Amino acid sequence: MSDIEIAQANEATAMWPITKVAAGLGLSEDDLELYGKAKAKLSFSALNALKDKPFGKLVLVTSINPTPAGEGKSTITVGLGDALQQRGKHPVIALREPSLGPVMGMKGGATGGGYAQVVPMEDINLHFTGDMHALTTAVDTLAALIDNHLQQGNTLNIDPRRILWKRALDINDRALRHVTIGLGGPTSGVPREDGFDITVASELMAVLCLAENIADLKARIGRIVIGYTYDRQPVTVADLKVTGAIAMLLRDALKPNLVQTLEHTPAFIHGGPFANIAHGCNSVLATRTALQLGDIAITEAGFGADLGGEKFMDIKTPVLGKTPDAVVIVATVRALKYNGGVALKDLQTENVEALAQGFDNLKRHIHSMQSYGVPVVVAINRFTSDTDAEIQFLIDACAKLNVKAVTATVWADGGRGGLAVADAVLAALDQPAHFTRLYDPQSDVKTKIKTIVQKIYGGADVDYEGKANSALRTIVKNGWQDLPVCMAKTQYSLTDNAKTLGAPEGFTIHVRDIIPKLGAGFLVVMTGSVLTMPGLPKVPAALNMDVTDDGKISGLF
């Protein structure tokens, strides 16, 4: 059966009312804002009541560089939560919520798969509780207010050529990357070049995911730099005097969403920045709540350890106030063979030699996560085409690095298929973690970037081209150089070239621009040809989707 067929079959008979799931966490119905029987948001009063509660253990799930189809990181995260519950623990899962772009495009949703899913799967993958729509509305409201300011006299002296703020849409639409607005004469606005980002790449998504409460949300929104004046001074949302209006639109979106797995493990799904063009982690509020309500919180960071993993460590943990007690790196035989040079069409054929070549990619990610001083476990997400020889090679190769590697079959078997991973994680949690920061936040921007390139990617140098050098001068001039850096880079490679696979060394990362995101609290470093508005593939997943006359959805994976 497909993911949606499994979800539909189980939702009808086994899904608990969300009030029952919440009761298992010690929450009453008064702590919830219900969205039907299966979804709820936590109220601000419930969040405030938890603020002094101690944290449990934190497990971060990340991965190697993936194939275009993804390697099942969310599936492993869900399955691990279910497996830990079977071991008598009280885990709480914290995931990002899906963007419609990948849902309608190629990669799929973010609810796991098979018998390791969060439900209601259709709702979560589509409109859920409306968070993405609220974010899109807030982004576009701010854009409209900026253009209205230009039209109504421009008292802030904003230079239309230097506006940074873009509009947003939660779908892949390459035709909107570069647009001209304000056409049609004097009553239709000030003509200027503009563009659209996908909603999850907008700074407001990062702000939502890093904000600790309404006051912090407003402070972060107010700091957002929307552009520059004619004399090149930064203009913020606070300067426009619309901080309160934008925060108002995001009031409910700030509250974490509570759902459940097919095995009733509680899961907070909240916020969804991409890891290749943003910081790739779910909200601080959701992760913090999971830490306070369970004895083990399991969360994931987008794409590989070079992207979401690094950003979780260097951007999210300082705000969260908690570092991981263990890291799980998800690997698949097919992705390692892909990194070893095997074509996509041949990945189901046994090839231990290519697997050995591709193993260097996993080795690089293991070393990068170990450099933070945290115990590492490798979870091999097993597919039916994997052979015993290939699996044994991976287990033995990891053992030579003193890393425990175990297989998982959670897609087919649910939590039962993740018990080996759960046991390895529990053993890792018994080891001491001595967290070490990758770089000093007070170091200069170039030093921070080069440190990531050398210590995480395995590269040698950084080349600054295009707008990057003038952007650096602006950052230093305005005193923003102490912010952490958020690398925008292809997810398919450790380099900035998606076609360079494996674990190359001695390469140069090409930085074309550095964009200050003062609300989020980091500097986005644009490398290679990465885009903040993706395009749909030649054969979008949307072509296989439908809804019957009685409202039953099909084709959603």
Swiss-Prot record:
Matches recorded under PROSITE patterns: FTHFS_1, FTHFS_2
Residues annotated to bind ATP: 67-74
EC number: 6.3.4.3
Alphabetical GO biological process terms: tetrahydrofolate interconversion
InterPro entries, sorted: Formate_THF_ligase, Formate_THF_ligase_CS, P-loop_NTPase
Pfam families given in the database record: FTHFS (PF01268)
Pathway given in the UniProt record: One-carbon metabolism; tetrahydrofolate interconversion
Swiss-Prot/TrEMBL catalytic activity: (6S)-5,6,7,8-tetrahydrofolate + formate + ATP = (6R)-10-formyltetrahydrofolate + ADP + phosphate
Molecular function terms from GO: ATP binding; formate-tetrahydrofolate ligase activity
NCBIfam families linked: PRK13505.1 (NF010030)
Family listed: Belongs to the formate--tetrahydrofolate ligase family.
Name of the protein: Formate--tetrahydrofolate ligase
